[in-house]
Amino acid sequence: MSTEKILTPESQLKKTKAQQKTAEQIAAERAARKAANKEKRAIILERNAAYQKEYETAERNIIQAKRDAKAAGSYYVEAQHKLVFVVRIKGINKIPPKPRKVLQLLRLTRINSGTFVKVTKATLELLKLIEPYVAYGYPSYSTIRQLVYKRGFGKINKQRVPLSDNAIIEANLGKYGILSIDDLIHEIITVGPHFKQANNFLWPFKLSNPSGGWGVPRKFKHFIQGGSFGNREEFINKLVKAMN
């Protein structure tokens, strides 16, 4: 019997080498992805720690400024607010065309829908036009965080997608340096350079009727007159908590 070694055909040899190369490439790509994800997680954790420190420092500074003002016998004057949260509290009946267009512009197309709005001269004028149909005010860090975590959805290809994974946020906002849900929250809170992109990515929040009702006999009177609509400043946080 011949002891001669059976040779592998050249085509089979090439195929085997190609398969080996592909397997090596897959392993290398997997290792690279794992390393990249590990690095990304470290970046996100580092940013989150920095954000938390930033929020706590800002809160302490305000408390100290109020104490200093009181000690000096004066009043603490807050910096001008840059952000409001607006909730639509009236349906479609008896709304004139112009306010209706503004509600659509601000993406407040349904009752109990809410959006963040950057405070500018132009947006303040828009809010005046729709004031009888909305409640708005200055959201706290806690309110913004709870809204995004509990009610946050992204707008992807005109679809409402839950923010269940940071990868969803990175895929849509990564080019702006927004990699995680906490990056997104920070961009909203600070009204950062990419606020417009971050805010447009967020689907308008769908809130519930306030737990325990509106608590006022005349819902469609101004807030300062004992009603519900208009600017309620920091009291918007209490309303959102009841609706979230």
Curated annotation (Swiss-Prot):
Q: Which domain of life is it from?
A: Eukaryota
Chief location of this protein?
cytoplasm
One term of GO molecular function: RNA binding
One Pfam match, by short name? Ribosomal_L30
Keyword Ribosomal protein among UniProt keywords:
yes
Q: How does it assemble?
A: Component of the large ribosomal subunit (LSU). Mature yeast ribosomes consist of a small (40S) and a large (60S) subunit. The 40S small subunit contains 1 molecule of ribosomal RNA (18S rRNA) and 33 different proteins (encoded by 57 genes). The large 60S subunit contains 3 rRNA molecules (25S, 5.8S and 5S rRNA) and 46 different proteins (encoded by 81 genes).
For this entry, the protein name equals Large ribosomal subunit protein uL30B
Q: Which organism is it from?
A: Saccharomyces cerevisiae (strain ATCC 204508 / S288c)
Gene name? RPL7B
